[in-house]
Amino acid sequence: VIFYSNGFEHWLWDDTQCAPRQVQGFFTKDELALLIQRRTSKALLGSVDVNKQIVERYYQHRAITAIGEHFETDKQRKSLLVMATGAGKTRTVVALADLLMRANWAKRVLFLCDRTALVNQAVNAFKTHLPDSSPINLVTESDQDGRVYVSTYQTMVGKIDEYRPDGTRRFGVGHFDLVVIDEAHRSVYRKYRGIFDYF
């Protein structure tokens, strides 16, 4: 893992995983240790089965498999999933998070929505299908810790600058391994780009 900086811009190069990328700061000691530990402990995504108890439809399985291949084989960090209303996007994301957690590719997940009702829906989906992930609704449970955090964009903007009593940021730039953006259209990206750049 290589960090390089000119004092104004910071770049991270995980030389075994992906191309260099600009980051908003340095990882904490714990975040770095996890990044290095994953080099030897993560499983091949193709060797881990999609949980059929979470997603039952063939196209959900195909979407998760394609995203896994995109991350693993193509060494990409971003993916776009487009599904019709009622097609099971939230459950697909829950199953993807489950797969990445079981393969040791992800420890913590951030799920961002534009409305509180969608936050509640996503938290309930994680509680139902992945209860061991300890889903946290950041809109109502702001002081809790878990593996899955669900928030509105507006709430997360405030949480980025939140500090713990010991003076460290609550959410460092390397805190989340998977960030899910629900309803990722241009107006959301333009308005809340700071969140996406930070993580």
Residues covered by each model-derived region:
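Short alpha-helical segments and helix-capping/turn motifs at coil-helix boundaries
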Residues: 133-137, 141, 187-193
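SF2 helicase catalytic motif II
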Residues: 167-199
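Activation segment
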Residues: 157-160, 188
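ATP-dependent helicase/translocase motor core
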Residues: 1-108, 113, 117-133, 144-148, ...
